[in-house]
């Protein structure tokens, strides 16, 4: 069966967009609201018709992620931006642990269904502060116990703020969702060693089409 780099790249861009948001919140205390929303909304797309449907069918919704993939896969001598690189590697590792843990997967699905039921209370706005706090709690309760915690670097003034902590955890949860998608469409870590150029080429094609 041929490797589907089209879908693998979309899913990986979703991971990279989420961890780029983590970095921005940690270092700047803010991130583009629309980009953040594109990642957060993906958490409620549980039965997509296609891989891109997870991101509302628009490659433009993954612009930051595609930029990040290009920087990661296209850097000289394959050298990664160590901070972003560490984040996506850890997110993929956690998503793989989640995939092997039926109990945690069931708990995650149940908690996300609760989020959907709560949405009408907040005018169906997944970006409402309480919704972000609830998503952050899911990350803490379901994902964090699966393995080593992801150590987020940034400015202490931002990292101590509860609202920033919640946005970081919600972004990481979106990254985990994209990591699960990445596995479902055939993503493996070996591809980063042996098929780096294919991922980069596909990313560049996507980016040019935006």
Curated annotation (Swiss-Prot):
Record membrane topology: Peripheral membrane protein
TM regions (residue ranges): none
Entry's family note: Belongs to the HflD family.
Protein location: Cytoplasm; Cell inner membrane
Organism whose genome encodes this protein: Actinobacillus pleuropneumoniae serotype 3 (strain JL03)
Record InterPro entries: HflD, HflD-like_sf
Pfam families attached to this UniProt entry: DUF489 (PF04356)
Protein name (database record): High frequency lysogenization protein HflD homolog
Keywords of the record: Cell inner membrane, Cell membrane, Coiled coil, Cytoplasm, Membrane
Keyword Cell membrane: yes
Classification via HAMAP family: HflD_protein
Subcellular location, principal: cytoplasm
Coiled coil: 103-130
GO cellular component assignments: cytoplasm; plasma membrane
């Amino acid at each position: 069966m041929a490797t589907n780099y089209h879908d693998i790249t979309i899913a990986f861009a979703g991971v990279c967009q989420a961890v780029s948001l983590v970095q921005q919140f940690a270092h700047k205390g803010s991130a583009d609201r629309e980009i953040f929303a594109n990642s957060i909304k993906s958490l409620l797309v549980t039965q997509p018709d296609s891989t891109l449907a997870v991101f509302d069918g628009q490659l433009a919704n993954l612009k930051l992620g595609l930029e990040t993939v290009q920087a990661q896969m296209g850097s000289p001598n394959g050298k990664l931006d160590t901070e972003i690189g560490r984040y996506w590697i850890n997110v993929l590792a956690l998503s793989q642990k989640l995939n092997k843990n039926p109990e945690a997967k069931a708990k995650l699905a149940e908690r996300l269904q609760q989020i959907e039921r709560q949405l009408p209370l907040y005018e169906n706005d997944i970006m409402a502060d309480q919704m972000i706090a609830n998503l952050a709690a899911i990350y803490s309760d379901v994902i964090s116990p699966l393995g080593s915690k992801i150590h987020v670097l940034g400015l202490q003034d931002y990292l101590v703020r509860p609202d920033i902590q919640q946005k970081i955890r919600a972004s990481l949860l979106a990254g985990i969702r994209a990591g699960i998608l990445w596995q479902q469409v055939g993503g493996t870590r070996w591809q980063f060693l042996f098929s780096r150029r294919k991922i980069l080429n596909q990313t560049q094609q996507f980016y040019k089409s935006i």
